[in-house]
Structure formats: structure tokens, C-alpha cells
Regions:
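N-terminal intrinsically disordered, cationic/polar leader segments
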Residues: 2-168
Length: 168
């Protein structure tokens, strides 16, 4: 029995050390939340090391309560923003992603521009192998708009690119 208790203790110590390594540099997770509703930027996003960088897999974030403002009228635009990516060396931390998305609340920007901004900011901090950002904007003025931004790492060979496309 004592032998099993020692093994469990060692396993917990290894898991705790691994968790500490993964969370180095993360400041938002587990901290009081301060919301910025008008200044979206890559500085709001945090990343942690991908523990499986040798494997291609898809991470999907869906933000169904996205809100921004029309830069001409100031009217709110509502959308569901979906981010899908195949991580390289880093993954985005989910609370920082939520805070980043909330930062668009009082930000005036056209739907096409802000969808591209989200993609650009995520590419900047993650350097993903593949990334797609899709914004499905609610109907306003009788027209619904869907914007899709696609990125594939240009440094990958054609075989790898085909494999990444097959993941979708």
C-alpha cells in the first residue's frame, strides 16, 4: 500500500511540474478579469506550448456572442465567430481568447476587416500550420454576411498542405 502511495505522489509531482511549465507566462487564467471593450489587439492573447507539436490536430473555438460596431452608423453587428486551427508550437489560451473577442464590443470596424484582424492577430501569436476564421454575421438591413479567412503556413511542402486540408 505504501508503495502505491509513493507512486501516486510521484505521478502528481510530475503532473504538477508539467502544468507549471505549460502555464509559465499566462497571466489571465485564474486571475481577476478586467475587460477592455474597445481596443482589440494581439497583446490580449496568450499562448502556451503545444504538448503535441508532432501531431496535426484541429482546435476549434466558437464565440456565438460576438459584437462589434458598424464604423459608419455605430449600430451593433452581432455574429458567431468560429476559429479553427492546426497548432504549430503554440496553442491559444481560452480565457485570453474570450477577453480578446470581448474587446471588439465597442470597436468600430467593417465585418470583413475585423475577421481579417482576428486571423492576423492569431497568426502573429500562434504561427499555426493552418487557420480559418469564419464570421457569420446576423442579418442587418435585410442582408446577412459571412466572411471566411483562410491561412496555411507557406513554409509547408505540398504533401503536408494536402494533409492539413484533409483535416477539415
Amino acid at each position: 500500500m505504501a508503495d502505491i502511495t509513493k507512486k501516486i505522489g510521484k505521478a502528481r509531482a510530475v503532473a504538477t511540474k508539467t502544468e507549471r511549465t505549460e502555464t509559465v507566462g499566462l497571466t489571465k487564467l485564474g486571475s481577476p478579469t478586467s475587460y477592455r471593450f474597445d481596443k482589440p489587439g494581439p497583446d490580449l492573447l496568450e499562448a502556451f506550448p503545444n504538448r503535441n507539436p508532432g501531431r496535426d490536430y484541429v482546435v476549434t473555438f466558437e464565440h456565438p456572442e460576438f459584437t462589434s460596431l458598424c464604423p459608419m452608423t455605430g449600430q451593433p453587428d452581432f455574429a458567431t465567430i468560429t476559429v479553427r486551427y492546426v497548432p504549430g508550437e503554440k496553442c491559444v489560451e481560452s480565457k485570453s481568447f474570450k477577453l480578446y473577442m470581448c474587446a471588439f464590443r465597442n470597436h468600430g470596424s467593417f465585418m470583413e476587416s475585423l475577421t481579417n484582424k482576428i486571423a492576423d492577430d492569431l497568426i502573429e501569436i500562434l504561427a499555426p500550420r493552418r487557420l480559418t476564421v469564419t464570421g457569420v454575421f446576423n442579418v442587418r438591413g435585410g442582408t446577412g454576411i459571412t466572411v471566411r479567412v483562410e491561412h496555411i503556413d507557406s513554409g509547408l511542402d505540398s504533401t503536408r498542405v494536402r494533409a492539413l486540408r484533409d483535416l477539415w
